[in-house]
């Protein structure tokens, strides 16, 4: 082989050195990029954590506002704070045992306290009357369902949409003799059927200025007798199957301190 055909060793060495230097620069650049990416990632994680905390605070403020609106509707009722917590938790338990998805259970938990928000529009002379209402007064009282639904209508918030359904339908009856529309059977939204039973049970078993609470056994008998009349049979069955849990909720709320009662979002979450 002739000498001229051999590769220039010095040239090859220079090229290899240049390649090595270039690779080192690329490696260093990638290391710096990796550090920058890691720093950016850590910053994003911090932003995400801060955002999650802000969202949680906003949600709790939103739920607390809902609770206070519900309280405003029944402000003169000394038991209303306990009532809306008990009733909402009864609703959530029934919904869960009926097999509703977790998100729907949460919605009814947070929406049901607004079932009587329309009472804001009912005159105190009727709302606070301790004796039996006249026929005319009762017709006025019944309008709280429509007033409540109107107050809650046209919201894009899912919880308020559920609350609207409950407000308008929780006094409907399975046999069609309820109000305001005289709906029957499955015409009544499920959330209204659930809230209607929970509301009646809590009213029966709670002390009011005009009555003593019914004994639990008697209240349960009334609920069972109204199966297929006032109440959805399936809702009654689930309610009675889980009466021990219902009574546990009642005991927890009745024995809770004032701090627990004042924080609805915290109370229902616990």
Language model features with spans:
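Metal-dependent catalytic cores of enzymes that make or break cyclic nucleotides
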Residues: 28, 35-42, 46-63, 67-270
